[in-house]
């Protein structure tokens, strides 16, 4: 297990209240040994004008999961901030909930690199994202 902080799904979801995570109804669903998963609806809050999941919403989901995963790998008063994120949008989604799955690529003492893949309800890859964070 890579997590240094002990936390429940309920506590993770409570952290999103009153901010963008809560507004977009991003829900943390699973904490694995080295994965963190969350879902987000494809609805009026997250669609672009042509009825498809907005690429920016996918990036919000990816950075939200990756940043929380990064925080869970720190100790004490350490904080995590995003340095760089990229995303390749490979399939659109029109409805339902998308699922983001976050895994570490590198866990260093000063930087982390996370791979976040976002899937539609049929398990098809919609977006592949990589987030680099700094530990402060």
Curated annotation (Swiss-Prot):
GO terms for biological process: menaquinone biosynthetic process. Its EC number is 3.1.2.28. SUPFAM superfamilies: Thioesterase/thiol ester dehydrase-isomerase (SSF54637). It catalyses: 1,4-dihydroxy-2-naphthoyl-CoA + H2O = 1,4-dihydroxy-2-naphthoate + CoA + H(+). Changing residue 54 to A: 514-fold decrease in catalytic efficiency toward benzoyl-CoA. Pathway: Quinol/quinone metabolism; 1,4-dihydroxy-2-naphthoate biosynthesis; 1,4-dihydroxy-2-naphthoate from chorismate: step 7/7; Quinol/quinone metabolism; menaquinone biosynthesis. The keyword Hydrolase applies. Transmembrane segments: none annotated. Catalyzes the hydrolysis of 1,4-dihydroxy-2-naphthoyl-CoA (DHNA-CoA) to 1,4-dihydroxy-2-naphthoate (DHNA). Also shows significant activity toward a wide range of acyl-CoA thioesters, and minimal activity toward benzoyl-holoEntB. This is 1,4-dihydroxy-2-naphthoyl-CoA hydrolase. It comes from Escherichia coli (strain K12). The gene is menI.
């Amino acid at each position: 297990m890579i997590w240094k902080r002990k936390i429940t799904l309920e506590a993770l979801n409570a952290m999103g209240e009153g901010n963008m995570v809560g507004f977009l109804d991003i829900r943390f669903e699973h904490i694995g040994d080295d994965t963190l998963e969350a879902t987000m609806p494809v609805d009026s809050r997250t669609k672009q004008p042509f009825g498809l999941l907005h690429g920016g919403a996918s990036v919000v989901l990816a950075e939200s999961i990756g940043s929380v995963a990064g925080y869970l790998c720190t100790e004490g008063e350490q904080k995590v901030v995003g340095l760089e994120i990229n995303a390749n949008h490979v399939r659109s989604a029109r409805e339902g909930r998308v699922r983001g799955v976050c895994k570490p690529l590198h866990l260093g003492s000063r930087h982390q690199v996370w791979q976040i893949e976002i899937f539609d309800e049929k398990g098809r890859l919609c977006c592949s994202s990589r987030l680099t964070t700094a530990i402060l």
